Amino acid sequence: MIGLTVRQMQYFEALAQTLHFGRAAKLAGVSQPALSSQIAEMELRLNCRLFERGGKSVRMTDEALAMLPRIERILADIREIETTARRGRPAMEGRFRLGIIPTVAPYLLPHVLPELKRHFPALQLELREAVTASLVEDTALGKLDAFIAAVPLDQPWLITEPLFSDRFFLAVPAGDPAFASPPVPPESPALERLMLLEEGHCLREQALAVCGSVRPVAMASYGATSLTTLLQMVAHGLGVTLIPEMAAGPASAMRDLKIVPFQEPMPQRTICLAWRRNKVRHDECVELAKIIRGLDQAVLAA
């Protein structure tokens, strides 16, 4: 009897998706030696080579390519088995793993969490804050049940349910004469001082799209990891930055910072809930989207 384990198949799937032992280990949430050891054990049990190692490159063998669809189906069935017990129970009960991007989490969660607790007291919510690419990967691997991010999301295996629109404003140093007469046109030369989040944050790409006709000269000098850091830099006169409306209320209370609008039509992003295109947790995700859409949008923008 071969006796493959679920863990070995999960590691195999991660390595097949990434073709890189380090990235596969990160996706699986284990150390690289642990993943390598389990892959080697899997090859020993199957009595065949699954991956060709050549320096930093990894290539799947013909045997591995033939096995991949079957292993993916097995793992998908296992994930469905793990959640089948929820069927027939009230919606949103038990463990639910939700991801959310950093430019939404601190502003949305304080409003969403009390509502979820009120409606679904048996819900065991597990939160993960990460950039969109990481949330997509975790959802693909079955490590998240759903996530909240900004569209567009181009993965055809995802269902996306729009939640709300979030307009963009500018955060500028208080007293800056370049912004004395708002609203600000997107082509304003003053936006050359635009500061951006580091690579990987969708807000960075959205800022570049909004101010695409202006070259942000400060971009190379500053790559902040959080919106809070960017706002502190703006308050110290180092530049300006794009800020979502849901963050503008709290930011307006900062000293030496001013929030100004763009010219109409104001740019905006659409925030959505996304989950895998299957029926396992579909009803629960629809219920979650309904709760979030039911929030008072004026409260979110406050």
Residue ranges, per PLM feature:
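A late-sequence structural motif
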Residues: 108, 257-300
